[in-house]
Amino acid sequence: MSLQSSIKKSAKLIKNNDERIARWISHVISPHIVGVVITAVVAIKFGDNPLEMLWWLLILVPIVVLPPLLYLLWLVHAGELEDIYMPDRSTRLRPLTVMMGWIFLCLLLIRYWQAPAIVEAFFLSAFVLIGILSLVTLFWKISFHGATISAAATATVMMAGSWAWPVFLLVPLVGWARIRLERHTPRQVFYGSLIGALMGLILVYGLILNLL
């Protein structure tokens, strides 16, 4: 089989399964997973003691992430949400308020436990990002997927250097997936990604670089 025919066959396969691929991308590169991965990688790489950072993350990530996620799953089971990504803007306010309240309580707990500053900085940034997106959601639907992957990609490149630029390819990939699934318009994805990129810059230049 020639290279050209292989490319055509692959393109046809993708075209015939594009919705399934978009759904898979949305699940794998979801805000929950992206947030955990970027926090773990940067905290372990740039923390003073990688083992200590890993220990803190093993404690804090389940405490911070699991209760809101289980709450969303419960709302889906109860028929109040279509899925955990809250596609209907009118149903987002209550879950987002609960998530904001929970993360705020976790920040108080993190401060009380005297967790490393870089770990606290990441969770504080997550709180601020969700807060900004929640305020926008009061008036207009915006892409949390786009904001999260854009913030993570920006922070990664700023911390790791130019070799990490390919990470930014995930931003349009996630954007395409959300648009293909008709969960967002291109404008909603664009502005979500823009807010995420700004938060990534603030996270790195405003917090992390001052802690290293």
Language model feature labels by segment:
Residues 48-52, 80-90, 112-117, 183-187:
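Membrane-interface helix-boundary motifs at transmembrane edges
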Residues 34-36, 97-108, 147-150, 195:
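Core segments of transmembrane alpha-helices
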Residues 2, 68-79:
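Membrane-water interface of transmembrane alpha-helices
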Residues 52-67, 125, 155:
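Alpha-helical transmembrane segments
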Residues 25-46:
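The first (N-terminal) embedded transmembrane alpha-helix
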Residues 116-212:
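Membrane-embedded catalytic cores of phosphoryl/pyrophosphoryl-handling enzymes
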Residues 1-22:
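Short, Lys/Arg-rich, polar N-terminal cytosolic tail immediately upstream
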Residues 22-25, 82-99:
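Juxtamembrane helix-capping/reentrant segments at transmembrane boundaries
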